[in-house]
A protein has these predicted regions:
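Phosphate/NTP-binding elements of NTP-utilizing enzymes
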Residues: 1-151
């Protein structure tokens, strides 16, 4: 299956002066699509974003303020059960940690309890293990629930 989002329209929540930067949005989408699914029937297959996921990524990473920084640095997204929340959250966390160009970037996951928070960490760690480029550059500290990226 090789489908691509055909009719993307930038977010209606763009602040005055902000613009849509297709190259930055394309980079974020491409980074995530280099990762692999870690669970279920899709395990080991490339993470091909479906339309609603791609719209979220393009809105968050392609909407740029006049100073060149992303307009959105916080997002609240509601996703129903069994719709790939953990996979998408892990992919975004890896993008922010390893692919955003920020030196010594820190990404934190929050949840109601430690076990719940560890779900996204475990998915991210598995994505790292399945991606040769990241596996060479990311140290997984499982006991601390920590990933360290070495550019």
């Amino acid at each position: 299956m090789n489908r691509k989002l055909k009719d993307y329209t930038p977010t209606r929540f763009m602040a005055e002066g902000s613009t849509y930067n297709k190259a930055k949005a394309d980079y974020a989408v491409s980074f995530i699509e280099c990762l692999c699914h870690t669970k279920g029937i899709w395990a080991g297959k490339p993470f091909e974003l479906i339309d609603w996921q791609e719209r979220i990524i393009r809105d968050l990473f392609g909407t740029i303020k006049p100073n060149g920084y992303r307009q959105f640095n916080t997002a609240y997204i509601e996703i129903p059960k069994k719709q790939g929340k953990s996979e998408l959250a892990a992919a975004v966390a890896l993008l922010l940690c390893c692919g955003d160009g920020e030196e010594r970037a820190e990404v934190y996951g929050c949840a109601a309890d430690r076990q719940q928070a560890s779900i996204v960490f475990e998915v991210a760690a598995d994505m790292v293990r399945m991606c040769p480029a990241l596996n060479k550059r990311v140290k997984i500290l499982a006991s601390q629930k920590r990933l360290i990226f070495y550019p």
